[in-house]
A protein has these predicted regions:
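ATP/Mg2+-dependent ligation/transfer catalytic cores
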Residues: 1-186, 210, 348, 378-438
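Short, hydrophobic beta-strand segments
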Residues: 90-96, 198-204, 251
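Catalytic-core signal marking the mid-to-C-terminal active-site face
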Residues: 224, 230-231, 254-438
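Accessory "access/gating" subregions that flank catalytic or transport cores
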Residues: 163-168, 172-186, 200-207, 218-234, ...
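Core alpha/beta catalytic barrel or barrel-like domain that forms the active/cofactor pocket
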Residues: 125-133, 145-162, 182-202, 232-249, ...
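Active-site neighborhood of thiol-dependent amide/isopeptide-bond enzymes
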Residues: 204-216, 239-240
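Secondary-structure transition/capping motifs at alpha-helix termini
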Residues: 19, 32, 120-121, 182, ...
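Short glycine/proline-enriched loop/turn "hinge" motifs that connect secondary-structure elements
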Residues: 79-86, 124-125, 189-193, 241-242, ...
């Protein structure tokens, strides 16, 4: 990491949509980060996609729109290298004035879930596969990007093409360099199944830091793309005739000796793995709102479009919602494939790991793993639209065991307000509100 020095700093915390909210300060004021002096309204973490306060939010008029203070997380500050003045960014989270974690902050919600694992002497390691499109979003339309080497517009997908990687090497290399500056490490970069679509696999690490990595990767990728006069979008379904963007989450659990408790030296994995799968399966439908938080998200969850539609699990089968990859038994892990690229990683990790922990603690048996094409099977379905997803999330008892009560309330109010707002917008224009934000 480069030596951190700049004239300004940025401080920010993620709202419930995973959008950063914060301030720019002179660098001489960085010392305020250690004295609880940088304050934001608690309601800043509970605005809608349009940046508006939530009507009837308990965080606004009911409480007098109370402030909390933000303080740096355990991550080191880093330069936003793609910006001309390269300010130093300090990732933060929110606390209340009595020094308690503000559980309306999704990062605190995940930390609370991970505490349940630590109390058992376990550590969760996780990683994500981040899909995104590079697009040309100028002049009021959404088009594939211009190939920077040939100066012609892309007209087709070329999955796993090294030529695509070579042609877009400048932007991809700069994304990777900016990620290294931020302490984010890649496993690989590939071209994907959509025209102008790429996937970056991030390296496994402590689950809280892995969720940070996913969120910051999105920020970095969008920023670098704009520098190159392109838009990088994690919108779940930018083009109706192309595959959507997913955020696949992989995780394992290590005991206090560093041994993977999902492994039993065989291909099937341990009973604990199956209980974790059982919990994830049980909570999946009610958690659809977390995995598909916007109307556009449901365009991705369609058959034969590289995204799950039914609730299922399987060994080495990418049509299932949960996949258990084969390979070295000592590296046994769960891959949860439902979440779109438009999600808040902290909420996704909380939903998945909270459900897995419930499954382990209650010894919830997983159903029989499927074989073959999941799309051709009669399976229980995820919520089919945003409205039903909101209702399921709001009313399911298991959700209330996984997420803090005030976070559930705030998220439901947010999504109901967004649903009303999007109903007023012409369908042909809705993409404009997602493209740079989610």
């Amino acid at each position: 990491m480069s030596k951190v020095s700049a004239k300004t700093i940025q401080v920010a915390v993620a709202d419930l949509n995973g959008i950063l909210r914060g301030k720019i300060l002179p660098s001489k004021n960085a010392k305020k980060l250690k004295t609880k002096s940088i304050r934001l309204p608690l309601s800043a973490l509970n605005v809608d996609l349009f940046g508006e306060d939530i009507e009837n939010s308990p965080l606004v008029f009911e409480s007098g729109d109370t402030d909390g203070y933000i303080t740096p997380t355990e991550r080191k500050p880093f330069k936003l290298t793609w910006l001309e003045k390269a300010p130093v960014f300090h990732p933060c989270w929110m606390f209340t004035d009595d020094d308690k974690s503000f559980l309306g902050d999704a990062r605190h919600s995940l930390a609370k879930t991970l505490k349940g694992y630590r109390e058992k002497g376990w550590t969760v390691t996780a990683a994500t596969e981040m899909e995104f499109y590079l697009v040309n979003a100028q002049h009021g339309s959404l088009k594939p990007p211009i190939n920077p080497k040939t100066n012609t517009q892309l007209v087709r997908a070329d999955v796993l093409s090294t030529q695509d990687l070579n042609d877009f090497e400048d932007i991809l290399n700069e994304i990777q360099e900016a990620c290294i500056e931020a302490g984010i490490n890649f496993e690989s970069i590939t071209s994907e199944s959509g025209c102008g679509q790429f996937e970056v696999t991030l390296k496994h690490r402590n689950a809280l830091l892995a969720a940070d990595d996913a969120l910051l990767f999105k920020v970095i990728t969008k920023g670098v793309a704009l520098k190159h006069r392109l838009t990088a979008t994690f919108m779940a379904k930018p083009y109706l005739d192309q595959p959507g963007n997913g955020m696949h989450m992989h995780f394992s659990i290590l005991d206090n000796e560093g041994q993977n408790i999902f492994s039993n030296d065989g291909d099937a994995g341990s009973n604990i793995l199956k209980y974790a799968v059982g919990g994830c399966i049980l909570a999946m439908k009610a958690s659809t709102l977390i995995f598909a938080p916007f109307e556009n998200s449901y365009e991705r969850l369609t058959p034969k479009a590289h995204a799950p539609t039914g609730i299922s699990w399987a060994y080495e089968n990418r049509t299932a919602a949960i996949r258990i990859p084969m390979g070295n038994p000592l590296s046994k892990r769960i891959e949860h494939r439902v979440a779109g690229g438009d999600t808040n990683p902290y909420l996704v990790f909380t939903a998945v790991l909270g459900a897995a922990l419930q499954g382990i603690e209650k010894k919830i048996d997983a159903p029989k793993p499927i074989q073959g094409d999941a799309y051709s099977l009669k399976l229980p379905r995820l919520a089919q639209n945003l409205s039903s997803a909101i209702d399921l999330f709001q009313n399911e008892d298991l959700i209330k065991q996984i997420f803090p009560k005030n976070l559930v309330t705030n998220l439901v109010l947010t999504k109901k307000q967004e649903l009303k707002q999007f109903d007023k917008i012409n369908s042909a224009d809705k993409w404009k509100y997602y493209i740079n934000s989610v």
